[in-house]
């Protein structure tokens, strides 16, 4: 009897340890660690090192060309490929830079120069913050500008954020076609 109890305890300890190690090894991040009790979102300070690169956009605009780099919390692409949706707690960070260019031997080359803004989204399948105007349509929405990179400045996702995402409504408000890692290995 003691042998069986010891075996059960050993098995439980092993499984708990295995799950913890698995979580640690895939670097899964709970996006709600970035959210306070009122639903205020902070920008993750280490997203360039810990998050996956989803994709890059070049936006050529007469008002100012931009480079958009989008990162996702670890495990996002794998989960999306398996389920066709973003997991609850997924974090997306879009870092927007200005763009510079020069004539090089190969052509007119362009590159990112000077961060302008960061957009941070946290997937919320449970509608946790229904009274917060920065939460809705399945996401928490936040905007941070270069002049105060730790200060969230959006006031209402319907006024400040979702307008740019309307063409992507059918894909959970995200332009997934720009992120091939979500659909291919």
Predicted segments, located by residue:
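Short, structured beta-strand/loop micro-motifs enriched in basic residues and often containing a Trp
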Residues: 67-77
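Positively charged n-region of N-terminal signal peptides that target proteins for export
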Residues: 1-5
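Bacterial Sec-dependent signal peptides at the C-terminal "C-region" and cleavage site
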Residues: 16-26
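Short acidic/polar alpha-helix capping motifs at helix-coil junctions
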Residues: 42-44, 71-72
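Bacterial N-terminal signal peptides
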Residues: 6-16
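Ligand-binding pocket segment of bilobal, Venus flytrap-like solute-binding proteins
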Residues: 80
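Sequence context surrounding c-type heme c attachment/ligation sites in exported
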Residues: 24-37, 43, 47-56, 60, ...
């Amino acid at each position: 009897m003691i042998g069986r109890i010891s075996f059960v305890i050993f098995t439980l300890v092993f499984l708990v340890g295995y799950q913890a190690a698995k979580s640690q090894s895939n670097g899964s991040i709970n996006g709600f660690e970035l959210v306070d009790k009122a639903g205020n979102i902070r920008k993750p300070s280490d997203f360039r090192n810990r998050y996956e690169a989803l994709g890059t956009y070049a936006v050529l605009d007469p008002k100012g060309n931009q480079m958009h780099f989008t990162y996702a919390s670890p495990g996002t692409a794998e989960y999306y490929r398996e389920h066709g949706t973003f997991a609850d707690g997924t974090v997306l960070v879009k870092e927007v830079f200005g763009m510079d260019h020069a004539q090089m031997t190969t052509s007119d080359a362009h590159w990112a120069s000077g961060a302008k803004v960061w957009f941070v989204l946290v997937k919320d399948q449970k509608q946790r913050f229904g009274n917060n105007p920065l939460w809705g349509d399945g996401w928490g929405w936040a905007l941070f500008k270069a002049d105060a990179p730790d200060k969230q400045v959006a006031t209402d996702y319907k006024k400040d954020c979702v307008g740019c995402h309307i063409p992507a409504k059918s894909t959970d408000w995200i332009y997934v076609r720009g992120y091939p890692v979500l659909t291919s290995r």
